[in-house]
Each structure stands twice: as C-alpha cells, then as structure tokens.
Amino acid sequence: MELFSRNVAAFWIILLEFLLGSVAEEEVLMNTKTETSDLKWTTHSRSKPEWEEVSGLDEENNSVRTYQICQADGSSSHWLRSKLIERRGASQVYVELFFTMVECSSRNTHHRSCKETFNLYYYQSDTDDATATHPAWMENPYTKVDTVAADFLLRKGGEKKVNVKTLRLGPLSKRGFYLAFQAQGACMALLSVRVFFKKCPALTRSLSVFPETVPRSLVQEAVGQCVANAAQPGPSPRPPKMFCGEDGQWVDQPTTTCTCLPGFEASHGELECRACPVGLFKMGSGTGPCSVCPENSQTGETGSAACVCRSGFYRALSDSADTPCTRPPSSPRSPVPQVNDTSLTLEWSEPLDSGGRSDLSYSVECRMCSTPGSPCTLCSDGVNYRPSQTGIQGRRVSIWGLRPHTTYSFTVMALNGVSAQSQQGPAGETINITTSPNVPVLVSGLRKSTATESSLTLYWNTPTQSHYRILQYQIRYCEKERGSEENSCHYMESNNNEVVLSDLRRATQYEVQVRARTFAGYGSFGKAILFRTLPDEDDSSSPLLVTGILIAMGMLLLIIVIGAAIYCIRKQNNYKDPELSDKNGQYLMGQGVKVYIDPFTYEDPNEAVREFAKEIDVSCVKIEEVIGAGEFGEVCRGRLRIPGKKENYVAIKTLKGGYTDKQRRDFLAEASIMGQFQHPNIIHLEGIITASCPVMILTEFMENGALDSFLRLNDGQFTPIQLVGMLRGIASGMKYLSEMSYVHRDLAARNILVNSNLVCKVSDFGLSRFLQENSSDPTYTSSLGGKIPIRWTAPEAIAFRKFTCASDVWSYGIVMWEVMSFGERPYWDMSNQDVINAIEQDYRLPPPPDCPTYLHQLMLDCWQKERTARPRFANIVSALDKLIRNPASLKITAQEGAGPSHPLLDQRSPLTPSSCGTVGDWLRAIKMERYEETFLQAGYTSMQLVTHINTEDLLRLGITLAGHQKKILSSIEALGIQNKAPGNVLY
C-alpha cells in the first residue's frame, strides 16, 4: 500500500511539473488597473475635445483610471501617449487593451466622419525625453502596431460589453518605449492598458535544471545544470541545453547527459536524484534504480555505492561490487592414501560447503615426522607432486621422492578465490602415513669435482640406510639440449659415491641423476642437477683463444672498412644501377624482387608504421556494424570515403581499451607488415587511424568472411575444380610471401578470407607468437593473448621453434585438407598432445570424402617429416595449374573418406619392392601409382630394372617433386638392392 501511495504521489508531481513547465510566465511592465493615482499621460489635439482622464469602476467594481474621448468630427487626430515603459530585456512585448466603443448609428453625428476604430503606435527611446512636441505627433517617427476595431459596440438600450484586444510589439532594442493611441472620429473609452512580456519559467526535467529564460528571438537557447547528486560523464561534457520559444513555452525535450551519481537513483520522473535507502545500493552512474544488496552483504547508510560483506564473507579482488559475498570452503572430506614404497597417491572428496564459489582448488602440505614426540617439519624440495602441490583442480595427487621407513603427515586444504582475504588459514584434513622400509633412500648432494672438455667427475652424499646395505649406484645423464630422447640419455654404474663420465661432448650441458640399489632393488632417482663440460681441453689454450679473438676482431674491422667503401661507391653511382635500389626500406634485389622488412628491426617501430601504412582521417570512415571480435578488440564493417575516390566498404579492426604500449605496437605491426604486400591473393591494407581513439586498421572488406566457416555453410556446394581454384589462389599468395622471405607462421583456413567472387586472400599477419611450455595441450600464444592450436603447425616448429617457408608448406597441406573436407576440424576431437604424438610416429590425415587422389598425395608431400623434402610454393602452384588444365584427373578419388572414426594413415613402413610382383603393384604400395604409365613408357617393366634408378633417372622421367623423389628412392634403398647410389634429391 505504501509503494502504491508513493507511485501515485510521484505521478501527480510529474504531471504538475509538466503542466507548469509548458505554461508561459508573464512579467508585467505596466498595468493601469493597479495605478492608485492619476496616470497623467500626454495628450495632443488640434481641436476639442481631447482625451480625458476619468475615474471609473472595473468589472469587479474596483476604482480604476481610464481615458475617454467622443469626437463629433473625424477630420482631426486626437493623440494619447503613455509614460516611458522599461522593456527589462524583452525583445517583444504584448499590449492588452480593455475598451468600449459607441456605435456610429447611435450617435448624432455625420456618419462619414464617424469611426469605430483607433490606431495603436509605439516609439522606442533610450532616455525619457518625450515632451509635448517631441516626438512629432504623426505616424513617423512612431511605429504603427495596428488599427484596432471593436468587436462589441455600445448602442442605446443595448448590452454593455467590453472589448479585449492583445497586440504584439517588437522587435524592441532600446531601453524603453512609449505607447500612443490615435482616435479619429471615434467615441470610445480606454478602460485599462496592460503591457507584459512572456518568458519560459524555471524548469526541472531529465535530471537537469534550467533557469527562467526570456526569449530574445524565435527560439532562445537556455543552458542548465545537473540536479543535486547528478553529473555528466566524461572529462569535459557539454552542459544541458533546452530551447525557449518566443511564446514563453519550452520547446521539445532537453539535450542532456545528466545521470545520478553512484548511490543515487532517479526519482519523481527524473526530477531529482534520491539516495539509495539502507539495504540498497547503486554501483555506477546512470538512470537505473537502486538494487538490493547481493547475498551476504549489507549497507549501513543511505546513498551507498557498494554493499559491505557481512562478517566472515569476502569478495575476491576480481569480483565486482554487484556480486554476492562468499566465504572460504570447508575442509576436504575423507582423504584416502595409497602407499607404494616411497610414493603415495592421495584422493579425497569435495568439501560439504564450497563457500558459494566455483573456483575451488586444493593444496597439499607435507610434513616429515622423523622421531616420535618431536614436531614434524616441512618436507624438503626432493618431494615431488603431480600435477602440482598447489592450485590442484582435481581431487587426486601423486607424491613421490619420500624417504623409506618414515612417517609423514599430509594435510589436504581446500581454497577458493576469497581464501586469501580470510584472516584464518584454509580448512584442511590431515592424514598420517608411513613409507616402506625396504626401499633405498634418495641420493642427495650431487656435485662436481672436476670437469674437462670431454668428461665430468661427480660425487654425492652416501645415504643413511639402516635396513639394507647399498650395493651399487646407477647414474643417468642426458644432453640438456636434446631433452629426454632415448638416444641422448646414458646410464652408468658405480660401486661408491663417485663417478667419472667420459666421452662427453665439448661445451655441452648435461642433466644428471643418481639412485641407489639394495637387496630390495633400485630406489627412485634423485633430483636432476645440471653440469657443463669445458669448451677447451685445459687452461693452456687461453693464449690461443686471445689470439683467435684478436684475429677475428681484425678481420671484422677490415670487413667494415671494405663495406663502407663499397657503400660510398654505390651511393655515388646509385642512379646508374637499376638492379639495386632502396625505396621506403624495401630492398629490391635483382629485377623487381621486393624483400620483406621486419618492422621490429626498426629502432622506433612507429617509424615502420609511418613508412608502410597510410594514415587516414577519421572523418573519412563511417562504422556501420560490428561483425566479429578478436584478441585485439572488435572487427567492424564500415565505409571509407576519401575525397576524389569512390566510396567502398572496408573491414575495420579496433584496438580494445586499456592496452599497453607494447600491445599497441604489436597491433600496428600487422599494418606495417600488410602495407608491404601488393598481391591479388593477399589482403589489401587501406590505411590506419592512430590520431584518435580507438586505434584502427582498415583493410578491404571480404564479403564471405573466413574460409573455414564459409565452407561449412556451403558444405558440398562447390565442385572439385572450384575448390582447386581456391587452393591455387592461396598457394599463389603464399608463393608471393615466400619470395619476399616472409614466414606467415599461422596459415589456416580461419585466416583465409573470401570475397564475393570466391577469391581467397591470406590475412592475419600478427607477430611475436611463443610456445606455452609445461602444458598438456601446448599452444602458440600471440602477443595480444590469443591462442593458436598447434595442429596446423609443422613438427620442427613445435619442437625447436624453427619457422620457415617449409613450415608454412606444412600448414598449407592442412589448409588443403580443410578445404577438401568443407571446413572439417583437422584431427577432429583428438587432443593437441595426441596430434603431436601421432605426427611423431609418422601418422597423417586420411583423404577427406570424395577427395581426388592427386590432391591427397600433394597433402602428404606437404607433410613430409623432413622439411627439405617438402615442395616449395612455386611447385604447388605449378602442380595445381596442371590439375586445372586437366580436370579429368580430379575424378580419381580415394576409396573411403575421412571421418572422426577413420584411422590416421600410417606412413612409417611403406611396402618395399620385394613384396610386390610388378612395377604397378610396387608404385601403388608406396602411393605413387600416378607414375605407373610413365615408368612403363620409359621401359621400366620389371622390378630388376627399377632397382637401378637414381635421381637423374627420375628427373628424366619428369618426377621433379622432391618428396616424390625421396619416397621412391627410399623404398628402393630400403632393401639394399640398389646397384648405383642415388644422387642427392634436387630441391
């Protein structure tokens, strides 16, 4: 009921405010009704009678001063002039006249000279200088307002009615004015004269207050201000504005951005900002209402912008003020240990109370209890945890590296996002276990005694072992740079706590571990320690090193001098040498071969942006709609209209707010890269906008968007020859990039854009990607934070970060597979780690459904493990051109298509000639059946003749792809039956 009453009251307040704001206010300048003494206006007449001032009664029987005149002859003018009336800033005023007029037919006078009208004039003046003769009693210098006619006339025996007329004067510009009345043959009485002007009253609307405003023109702009507890957003906002009409009424709605401050809500129809009551809050500025405090929070006063958490409840630093307060979780339940010698698997159940949060994690604290009765101490660094000791997401942890026959106390603690805010420690559940006495203890204290160029002498502490005598030590050492590959690790045994590792590589780092063996068997390896062999055999070689350094420095100085001389000579003759020129930092090698310039090689990366990208004025760009979002910000469609050029659509990448200087440089680096490329299959850079916020990159607009989603939307709608045409365009663009020595690093169908003519263009030239290590699902991460799945990346790029044009060729093979499968995800739902393992074991993607055999073989060529065996992009473009000229070859397809349940192709052990009876069988076994007719026409009709083939023979047969050459020669060489050693594969 109370809420209903408040709403009704608010309605009437709003209605009253609206009505008051829409009614004009009148300010009276003169009113003869209110005068209590004689008016003493000036009269002028050349003949009798004159205007006569008399006292009379108005309609309410109040005594008023009036003027009257009744002329018998209308040939002369009779004037009546008021005193000076101050205009008080008004540019136009209104004159309200109350008068009576006698009908001519009721008078005993000549009808032709009798009139039933009179004239109204005014005269402006800055001083009150009017006299009996000045200004002259004539129409000029007076300004005529109107000839006033009576609506009601007095006649004998008739009803007495008063005429009321309101006339407008203006425009007025001087200090004041005089009113003048001219009667010519009229019989009338001027009962009252009221002079006033209209003004817009003070108004409150849309949380803005506007002052009383006098209109000085057709519309007068009024500047207001926000109501109390309201403000406008932004550093320098424009004040509220509204227009006052000449009729004294406000025109339309105000132009304002006033909103209530945090802790206040709009009330009474946006007439005021009212403080939020206790128990309610409003966290930001705006016209929205106050909200009830989130769960477990409260306010202690009115006008609160945030609710304070109740005792025992907290908010994480990342939580916003409108989220509920939460508390730390209760302890994990029922920890269950599984002890295996000196290792432990610990599992537990989740807490009964998660604290109201979903970011639950666990930590494990380990304490070793050496002797009964003494306090337990924290475990040493030799204890290992999987997946980790802290931040565990699951409810299971494996622990190893424990000492045998030792009691440990493990505490499993539950934490969430507000555990750090709590003054109490995390709740935990403790369990005690004792390890087996039969396992040797860990070996510790491994250190180096001496080191040479090819050996390391190491020793370690003898473990304290009371149960079994240590029989032997085993040493495991691996080259650090080669990781834990089986062929890089070696083992040695030692009967004492010292060992000499010999036959080591010079200046190489080794990772060494030691474990002990007793009658109970081997224990666990101790902590891995790194040691490095020396670069020289002994210290006596130091003089040779110094001599070598001096020689190298001398040669370097000589090279610098020669280079400077060559530079000066070429600079003098530069106009004569068309083969080598330098323009805008892009070096032309030979005849028109442009080389890509890395923008990060500039001392100031902004210089590269200015050099390769054109700055566009923001007024030339109109953003129409948001079409996507990326790691940098939003992607929009817009129009670009440059004076003198045709308007066209563009794609606009914007940099999201809150960026760092490095993120801005990385964002604009893509523009300085794109600006160097001019090719029909490379996305074209229109320009950049850096002079205003947000920073933008403008490129040509591609109507069909990304290739992968476009293919999925049009699954099965394109013929093989159309798909080959798309692939040919992508390969042509990549050929152009490779010729400029640019490595893309992220070639995938999602980064290929398609226009309305199905032309495919390579895009996304972001840089600075690095590999996230120590992850079960490794991904490349760009500098702006976006993750790139590695299933498009060549194995050498994953393992050694070796990005080359050959690694781009591998990625192109994956793009081919995406195109022929109409946007299928490569390797389907396999994890990234499974993909890495499969590729390392020489498994490859099978052909997509209805994929031409020739195209799948080209994919396999791109996926050669040895990067030097992969075709170049020039070879790929040539091969696809042949397919387009001979579309019949596209009709030969694989027997079965790929799918999530289809196994990967095993490329590890191709069939050898010995298992095949004919040349055709052998070629089909190694997936080279396309060359069967070529072999037979050249006379290779038996396997005996095939075994004599070498590289030169393959070239004569027209087999030029390096991958095909290697596969054929490797199959022959595998049996050791080749009489002539094959030549090197030609690249």
Swiss-Prot record:
First and last residue of the signal peptide: 1-24
Keywords, in A-Z order: ATP-binding, Cell membrane, Disulfide bond, Kinase, Membrane, Nucleotide-binding, Receptor, Repeat, Signal, Transferase, Transmembrane, Transmembrane helix, Tyrosine-protein kinase
Domain SAM positions: 914-978
Principal cellular location given in the protein's record: membrane
Enzyme class: transferase
Topological domains annotated Extracellular: 25-548
GO cellular component terms, A-Z: plasma membrane; receptor complex
Topological type in the membrane: Single-pass type I membrane protein
Catalytic activity reported: L-tyrosyl-[protein] + ATP = O-phospho-L-tyrosyl-[protein] + ADP + H(+)
Fibronectin type-III domain span: 328-438, 442-536
Subcellular location as annotated: Cell membrane
Sequence intervals crossing the membrane: 549-569
Cytoplasmic side: 570-987
Record-linked Pfam families: EphA2_TM, Ephrin_lbd, fn3, PK_Tyr_Ser-Thr, SAM_1
Top-level taxon in the UniProt lineage: Eukaryota
Residues given in the record as ATP binding sites: 627-635, 653
GO BP terms, alphabetized: angioblast cell migration involved in selective angioblast sprouting; blood vessel development; convergent extension; ephrin receptor signaling pathway; lymph vessel development; venous blood vessel morphogenesis
Region: Disordered, residue numbers: 319-340
KW Transmembrane (keyword) present: yes
Disulfide bonds: 70-187, 104-114
UniProt entry tagged with the keyword Transmembrane: yes
Family note: Belongs to the protein kinase superfamily. Tyr protein kinase family. Ephrin receptor subfamily.
Protein name as annotated: Ephrin type-B receptor 4a
Organism in which the protein naturally occurs: Danio rerio (Zebrafish)
Gene: ephb4a
